[in-house]
Amino acid sequence: MDDDKGTDTAKEGCSTWCLLEAACSDDSDLDDSLEKLFEENAESDVSDLINDDDNAAQGNSRELLCQQESEECEQQIQYLKRKYNISPEAVQQLSPRLQSLNLSPGHKSKRRLFVEQDSGLELSLNEVEDFTQELEVPASAPGPAAQGGVGLGHIESLLRCKNAKAVLLHKFKEGFGISYNELTRQFKSNKTCCKHWVLAIYGAKEELIDASKQLLQQHCSYIWLQTYTPMSLYLCCFNVAKSRETVVKLLISMLQIHENHILSEPPKNRSVPVALFWYKGSMNPNVYAFGEYPEWIVTQTMIQHQTADSIQFDLSRMIQWAYDNDHLDECSIAYNYAKLADTDSNARAFLAQNSQAKHVRDCAQMVKHYKRGEMREMTISAWVHHCISRIEGDGQWQDIVKFLRYQGLNFIVFLDKFRTFLQNFPKKNCLLIYGPPDTGKSMFTMSLMKALRGQVISFANSKSQFWLQPLADAKIALLDDATEVCWQYIDMFLRNGLDGNVVSLDMKHRAPCQMKFPPLIITSNISLKKEKKFPYLHSRIYEFEFPNRFPFDSDDKPLFKLTDQSWASFFKRLWIQLGLSDQEDEGEDGSTQRTFQCTTRQVNGPV
């Protein structure tokens, strides 16, 4: 041990302590030193190197572990909540028949939007596929078919389907070789009414289908029926328009089937292929047909109707129709002429036009021109005769006479003033009927305007310079309920017109026209004779007072019937007393005369 071993002399730049080396000792010396070390007390310099305290504090390690376990548990519970979703196949394990009650498939669980990056457990759970194993449930065998009917197997297979309508459409196309939607147009509302219905019936018994052939005859004018078991196809043309609800209820009561076994839509009545389907199908010996073909099938399959449809639209024929039927408004012309499409080829051609609105405006404008020219050519006698000849029904002229006497008027005086009023004599062409409210002034005058087709003007429109324009198209006119402001306007601006002179009348969208005022009746609550501020109107207007309240019976019906028929009887009875000319002097001698013609048709040819 005393041998001098170790490094040699120190190198340059090294200190002398680096040359110190540990001295080796024997094993006995090492054991003695270890025993001596353990025998020393704990207060030695190396006592802090070993912590042998049994009650050492845990610190935050246990709390941290609890938090980590709690978070992990919450994450797993949340994951299970998202993943847990009972599939319809799992429910079917309880009962195989529950499969027929499924209306819609179950929804899969939603994927998590945010996935935390952890030690790998969460990621491994998310990798599990959302998969539910389908269990095969043996379906019950279809029951045997009833005598003359359809077995329960068809009904159960239909109920087991999730989309019954799609299955019916598929079976319809398989049986008849054509899509149901190609034959029909869709009605979204069950309340919409239609006369023609295409009905597809599924699963009805044969004896009930045969019985329906007779039962439907009392409801339909045409029946088309073909059966490919278990489907049956009907085309029913009912006598009156029916809604889908009514038709379905009728079939349910006849065929004893469920509502889901019926497809009901109206046919495409403007499609030539669809019309040919029904027309050619009726020739099939397996098809039952009752009644005559509906009009929409005939018009698209018969040769004469096809040639009639090729006729071009003639505006003059439309104008002639409107003139003959006294249609002046555009809405009335369009609506009533469209209703003639089933019987009039020109109306059918009108509906095929893309410029129907333009034709209606042109027709209304031309009819107004013709009517205005016809009215201006007539005398007052011819006009009164023209108006009352178009009033249907009988009336009592005594009702008008009794009402005038009830108001305290001398009928002879009224008749004389009314005669000069109709003749439109200067300063005698205006009558005033005044009195308290509810005495029948407006009722009396309005009934006269309606019978003679007069025009009514209102002072409420006096702010417009065109408020007197209706006087240009009238043989007789009425100004109802004239107030003091209205009398001031008449006294200031209309005295020249009441004199019977020619005045200039402003016309909208046209140049002012030169004309004379027609006979004018005015109703008011003010008497001009009692008003000294209008002295210039006293000689131009003759007054009649209605002082008594208009009478009604216990049922609130007027005691005096002032109707069109009453005025027609009044003019016929007092024609001569009113100074109206004899119609024989004006050409009304009873001979057949040619009516006004505004079309190029032949006089004695077909209309």
Curated annotation (Swiss-Prot):
Ranges of compositional bias, category Polar residues: 590-607
Modified residues (Phosphoserine): S87, S95
Binding site for ATP: G435, P436, P437, D438, T439, G440, K441, S442
Keyword Kinase: no
EC number(s) on file: 5.6.2.4
GO biological process per UniProt: DNA replication
Residues joined by cross-link Glycyl lysine isopeptide (Lys-Gly) (interchain with G-Cter in SUMO): K516
Disordered, as annotated region: 583-607
Motif (Nuclear export signal): 94-103
Molecular function per GO: ATP binding; ATP hydrolysis activity; DNA binding; DNA helicase activity
Swiss-Prot/TrEMBL catalytic activity: Couples ATP hydrolysis with the unwinding of duplex DNA by translocating in the 3'-5' direction; ATP + H2O = ADP + phosphate + H(+)
Chain segments annotated as coiled-coil in the UniProt record: none
GO annotations of cellular component type: host cell nucleus
Keywords: ATP-binding, DNA replication, DNA-binding, Early protein, Helicase, Host nucleus, Hydrolase, Isomerase, Isopeptide bond, Nucleotide-binding, Phosphoprotein, Ubl conjugation
Entry superkingdom: Viruses
Family named by the database record: Belongs to the papillomaviridae E1 protein family.
Function description: ATP-dependent DNA 3'-5' helicase required for initiation of viral DNA replication. It forms a complex with the viral E2 protein. The E1-E2 complex binds to the replication origin which contains binding sites for both proteins. During the initial step, a dimer of E1 interacts with a dimer of protein E2 leading to a complex that binds the viral origin of replication with high specificity. Then, a second dimer of E1 displaces the E2 dimer in an ATP-dependent manner to form the E1 tetramer.
Protein name listed in UniProt: Replication protein E1
Gene, per the UniProt record: E1
